[in-house]
Amino acid sequence: MNGKYKLMITKAAQKDKEKIKQYPALKRNVQNLLELISDNLFQNPPPYERLIGNLKQCYSRRINAQHRLVYMVYEEEKTIKIISMWSHYEF
């Protein structure tokens, strides 16, 4: 499951990315996480969790205490779809 994955960012996540640009520490954390999951999807640490309920196909990693990076993995296409980069599962 390792190898380079292509990142796809949803419109909602793109809006989140614009908000994050205002906060250098958040921006740096997001960039680091995006590079990490692109190169080594299930590297731990930093910890990730598989979500449940209507988000059961998604994974989450902590950006900071308040914000989470939420994404879906399409293994066959080697693609990661970024769903959210802001708040804590509010989408």
Predicted regions mapped to residue ranges:
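Blade/loop signatures of beta-propeller domains
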Residues: 39-41
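Acidic, metal-coordinating catalytic cores used for nucleic-acid/nucleotide bond scission
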Residues: 55
